[in-house]
Amino acid sequence: MSSSPSLNTWSDALSGFSIGWFPLGLVIVAAIPLVFIALYALTYGVYGERKISAFMQDRLGPMEVGFWGLLQTLADILKLLQKEDIVPTVADKFLFVIGPGILFVGSFLAFAVLPFGPAFIGADLNVGLFYAVGIVAIEVVGILAAGWGSNNKWALYGAVRSVAQIVSYEIPASIALLCAAMLAGTLSMQQIILMQAGPNGFLHWFLFTNPIAWLPFLIYFISSLAETNRAPFDIPEAESELVAGYFTEYSGMKFAVIFLAEYGSMFMVSAIISIAFLGGWTSPLPNIGGLELNTMTSGPVWGAFWIIMKGFFFIFVQMWLRWTLPRLRVDQLMYLCWKVLTPFSLVSFVLTAIWVINH
């Protein structure tokens, strides 16, 4: 596939302007639209989980606030804003306060390299995939700060479990993504997508051009569930054992920020798997004879639509699994990581290398 020039749209557009002596202003201005889009999407991700959970339990879910309960999440935010911000007297106040902030920053910084379309990306880094994986790992620091700073044994147990889980599953997840990078020959997210673009839609995606790609695809998806503490890997938040895990002592907006960070991570890993194996913002529809479906459903607006829909699809699957699979034990969690996913990820890496050499 042919490559395209750099698409650092926002940074290029802002490069001709200067905000006084404060260069950071350029970054802030560029980040504002992305932050609002992310917050809007994640706010309704909470609403979506409530509705999906209700459907699977034969309930209606939120219905009273707005049409079909669409304003329920906004009402909850207003409620949390009015809640008392409680800091335990025995807590390490600095760590207790900064923990949710680190979680939030770690979750949303990765959006800077996420391509929402052919010309809608914060920064097209040539190591974008590596950056996204690494920056999400910052959440480990926030989790540990929240658990330790709470000075609560249940919070600390939950934090230690979460850190062990995230660090362990980063290994098979990273190796699985390296398979996609090897197929594309680059770590740039935009270039990985462009390598999967073409008039035949989904037939150009790595998942359908390389049978080996199914193995790293499944490995990364399973690992992403563990990295985001989603069921059946929600051991750090096991209510029957740890009350609420590392955020047991949090209330008000600090509690809300932790949940926003969780949903931000859910969308981020869903977007990464879409980019690495399912063509990112490219249309799945092929051109059939004179019916140019792919051409008609491509472009900046369609690109944003497709990657958001692919991301929401994987978020739906994560929510679906929450109500389908029982929670694993700690020993089962570690066994799956070190004795199943990690060896298979190495096998997939070798097979992908052989495929690339021979094709």
UniProtKB/Swiss-Prot annotation:
Q: Where in the cell is it found?
A: Cell inner membrane
Does the UniProt entry include the keyword Cytoplasm?
A: no
What membrane topology was assigned to this protein in its record? Multi-pass membrane protein
EC class of the enzyme, as a word: translocase
UniProt xrefs under NCBIfam families: PRK06076.1-2 (NF004741)
Q: Which PANTHER family match?
A: NADH DEHYDROGENASE SUBUNIT 1, NADH-UBIQUINONE OXIDOREDUCTASE CHAIN 1
What parts of the sequence cross the membrane?
A: 19-39, 94-114, 127-147, 175-195, 202-222, 255-275, 301-321, 337-357
Q: Which GO terms describe its cellular component?
A: plasma membrane
Question: Lineage of the source organism?
Answer: Bacteria, Pseudomonadati, Chlorobiota, Chlorobiia, Chlorobiales
Q: What does this protein do?
A: NDH-1 shuttles electrons from NADH, via FMN and iron-sulfur (Fe-S) centers, to quinones in the respiratory chain. The immediate electron acceptor for the enzyme in this species is believed to be ubiquinone. Couples the redox reaction to proton translocation (for every two electrons transferred, four hydrogen ions are translocated across the cytoplasmic membrane), and thus conserves the redox energy in a proton gradient. This subunit may bind ubiquinone.
- Residues in coiled coil: none
Q: Which reaction does it catalyse?
A: a quinone + NADH + 5 H(+)(in) = a quinol + NAD(+) + 4 H(+)(out)
One Pfam family from the record? NADHdh
Q: Which UniProt keywords apply?
A: Cell inner membrane, Cell membrane, Membrane, NAD, Quinone, Translocase, Transmembrane, Transmembrane helix, Ubiquinone
Please give the organism. Chlorobaculum tepidum (strain ATCC 49652 / DSM 12025 / NBRC 103806 / TLS) (Chlorobium tepidum)
**What is stated as this protein's family in its record?**
Belongs to the complex I subunit 1 family.
A GO BP annotation: aerobic respiration
EC number(s) for this protein? 7.1.1.-
Q: How does it assemble?
A: NDH-1 is composed of 14 different subunits. Subunits NuoA, H, J, K, L, M, N constitute the membrane sector of the complex.
Designated name of the protein: NADH-quinone oxidoreductase subunit H
Q: Name one GO molecular function term.
A: NADH dehydrogenase activity
